[in-house]
């Protein structure tokens, strides 16, 4: 049985994610590392792109401890066939050759064949898709973002993840393998 992560939202709803260690082992380890230490708790979702995705954070949850990059999953595990990315999946964001974000996960709102093998699917939503579809429709406002060509809109009324509750089914998960060279993205710089 797979580990699960339950996102308890401030509005009382919850999103339950089944984590898929066999599909993206190091990515799952990194998510568990951040979630188990409470770094995702009391976090307002930072970016919503209707018709594309809900980005939970682009600042590593505002914690220096989460400001690290991990190797692309295909480099660590070329033998694993990556899963297709579509609504109902949970994917890890990344910064190209610099690596994947430690814990900057997102929910696709459409089929994303161009993401396959780049932004790994490391979980699937087993409860609470209605909450994700609700998030797609909330009122947003633009915010300044330091990466050219990337438009960022945040909810006008904060949509807060109160707490992430893990059920690791009695298993232990190691700390993630990190990139040897940490070329941190510009959207993290204002926090260092």
Place the predicted regions along the sequence by residue.
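Cyclophilin-like peptidyl-prolyl cis-trans isomerases
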Residues: 1-192
